[in-house]
Amino acid sequence: MGKLTVCTSKPYLNFSRAIRTYLCGSKCDNAIYFTPQKIVIELVQEKKTTQLLLLLAASIALYLLSPQLGARMLFELVQARTTSVSNSSVAAALFACAGEEIINPAIFLFLHVLTLVIVLAMAAEVIYNRCRRTTRPTAPPPPVNNADFNLADALDETYNK
């Protein structure tokens, strides 16, 4: 697995710079190394984890494809600056599994399936809310004035006699 390098004494303030440094491949003297677990801790502490689909893709990229692709996805995630504290534990579990040797592949698969279910539920909720917003209730028909009908009926009865 790859490691991210931060060229600063305050990594909490410059975490996106750490990912950018990793992507560019530049080196520095006072390096702080980031493992995928440390990346998750930074993301959760900065409250920038949401977009579980991107998290899922990044974890798969970190585990299967290449650390650089995973880091690029993480950079996009950090740049989004969106927050969802409820999903941070799922994100942390995914990246912890992606960065470590997998002892039990069933747990890894379970976490990915769980994340996919959460993503689909969030997407369904967004679609449902958009549909609810676009379909406006139709106006009820105007109330019928019974007095007019009664007058017309009375006139008809009067003239028909």
From Swiss-Prot:
Its annotated compartments are:
Host membrane
This chain is glycosylated at: 14, 87
Q: Which GO terms describe its cellular component?
A: host cell membrane; membrane
Protein origin, superkingdom: Viruses
Give the record's keywords alphabetically: Early protein, Glycoprotein, Host membrane, Membrane, Transmembrane, Transmembrane helix
* Membrane-crossing segments per the record: 102-129
How this chain sits in the membrane, per its record, is: Single-pass membrane protein
What is this protein called in UniProt?
Early E3 17.7 kDa glycoprotein
**Origin organism of this chain?**
Murine adenovirus A serotype 1 (MAdV-1)
